Amino acid sequence: MTRFVFITGGVVSSLGKGLASAALAALLQERGYKVRLRKLDPYLNVDPGTMSPTQHGEVFVTDDGAETDLDLGHYERFTGVPATRADNITTGRIYLDIITKERRGDYLGATIQVIPHVTNAIKEFVLDGNEAYDFVLVEIGGTVGDIEGLPFFEAIRQLGQELPRGQCAYIHLTLLPYIPSAGELKTKPTQHSVAELRSIGIQPDILLCRCDRPIPREERRKLAQFCNVRESAVIEARDVESIYDVPLSYGEEGLDREVLALFGIEAANAPKLARWRTISERVKNPEGEVSIAIVGKYTGLKDAYKSLIEALTHGGIANRVKVNLEWIEAEIFEREDPAPFLEGLNGILVPGGFGQRGAEGKIRAARYAREKKIPYFGICFGMQMAVVEAARSLAGIEAANSTEFGPTPEPVVGLLTEWMRGNELEKRAAEGDLGGTMRLGAYTAALAPDSRIARIYGDTVIQERHRHRYEVNMAYRERLEAKGMRFSGTSPDGLLPETVEVEGHPWFIGVQFHPELKSRPFEPHPLFKSFIEAAVVQSRLV
């Protein structure tokens, strides 16, 4: 029997519903249950693919090519289970599907309404394909009271009535703010949030209370009384040093035990959390530290690089070091000398991005790393700019540039118009739509057996996730390789470059894919593990 747990949020946004959902899933997994995580997003975009990273944060790409919410990254990292396009849906996607059906005549002239058509579509999404799971955890984006979230709250309310008794539960994540002048945590915002939730027909079974200090017994009793939950169901979600402490914290508070009790399951054994304790210990007690520069264009919102940050942390865990991140806006290097910003750092990473802004700054960062023998990791756009830099500085192609920025006589990077997905040829046009038209999802790459990157992977055939519209031009391969920039990995047909590396450099690698999307705390991605290892070596030379 599949059981459903719906996770909602109240009082303020950005409380960490995604992390809470992922942590609960990890706890249930450690008890031996099969868990699925899903996300309902109330915004009207069909997917986050065309949304600004500075507004929405990272776009997390799945193996099957879906552009999804960054919370799916938390789901994968905490559970180790790859997400799919079937694990995330938006209001925009639902409306698009419904309107397409209406235009086709599928509704036979019926009046299309939010209830029942939109709510039914939400319910169908939630209920579909769960036969293999013991628990399905469904996170509802946004905050209770948001207008755009009402159809989702109504849908999960209806599911509470339609599912068999004992098959559905609700967790409400809320905030207990501390007021210094009063010297106490305040429960009133949570009471009002729960009242709002109850007004639309949902009674939470568990309160997950974010706070920065212990909840006094009297405040727990007050919350239980006025929010109509058991006192044992008032769970303290206190701030922790690392997100990898969250499962440990929730486990100590008994969140998983309380969830099992809701479904009448006797929790015979405690979850096996030894590996989480190991991760926590390594994060808290590193044996050294390194400093990495991230030269990007969305540095104002760190969530734009969420998976990247975590992958670097995983590399640090693997090498038992703390990874300090120095965030540098790429445009600065277009006006100033990079040296004062990059001197003394142990590695330089240029992540993915779109557009011309900051591109020349990234090129200058790549040149500095190459000339100063500092470990360099270029991801997607970061690889492309490293190749442009090598074309200009090493191969003497002064006009080398990307057609993404406009016409150029030397298109070292150009628009990717066709490629193979398995045995099928996919095509795109320059004038086509932006949404969902990139090279998206997992693709296979073939690595040169004697290359550094093949040694790092321990294999010559790999599969990584992509999200890009432009690609390095293979017509320049011979001239670049003659100057020491090796095309060490390509698509299986040899037509598309996937990785480059600079020969004679301690560690200079560019990849067209996004390896950060597949890194896990218990399985650090080999490239990030190796990059941080190279940074550790560099730190001993400074």
From Swiss-Prot:
Keywords: ATP-binding, Glutamine amidotransferase, Ligase, Magnesium, Metal-binding, Nucleotide-binding, Pyrimidine biosynthesis. Residues 291-541 form the Glutamine amidotransferase type-1 domain. The active site is at C380, H514, E516. This is CTP synthase. L-glutamine binds at G353, F381, G382, M383, Q384, E404, R469. Transmembrane segments: none annotated. Allosterically activated by GTP, when glutamine is the substrate; GTP has no effect on the reaction when ammonia is the substrate. The allosteric effector GTP functions by stabilizing the protein conformation that binds the tetrahedral intermediate(s) formed during glutamine hydrolysis. Inhibited by the product CTP, via allosteric rather than competitive inhibition. Its EC number is 6.3.4.2. UTP binds at S13, K186, T187, K188, P189, T190, Q191, K222. Homotetramer. CTP binds at S13, D146, I147, E148, K186, T187, K188, P189, T190, Q191, K222. GO terms for cellular component: cytosol. ATP binds at S14, L15, G16, K17, G18, L19, D71, R238, D239, V240. SUPFAM superfamilies: Class I glutamine amidotransferase-like, P-loop containing nucleoside triphosphate hydrolases. One of its GO terms (biological process) is 'de novo' CTP biosynthetic process. Coiled coil: none annotated. GO terms for molecular function: ATP binding; CTP synthase activity; glutaminase activity; identical protein binding; metal ion binding. CTPSs have evolved a hybrid strategy for distinguishing between UTP and CTP. The overlapping regions of the product feedback inhibitory and substrate sites recognize a common feature in both compounds, the triphosphate moiety. To differentiate isosteric substrate and product pyrimidine rings, an additional pocket far from the expected kinase/ligase catalytic site, specifically recognizes the cytosine and ribose portions of the product inhibitor. It comes from Methylobacterium sp. (strain 4-46). Pathway: Pyrimidine metabolism; CTP biosynthesis via de novo pathway; CTP from UDP: step 2/2. Catalyzes the ATP-dependent amination of UTP to CTP with either L-glutamine or ammonia as the source of nitrogen. Regulates intracellular CTP levels through interactions with the four ribonucleotide triphosphates.
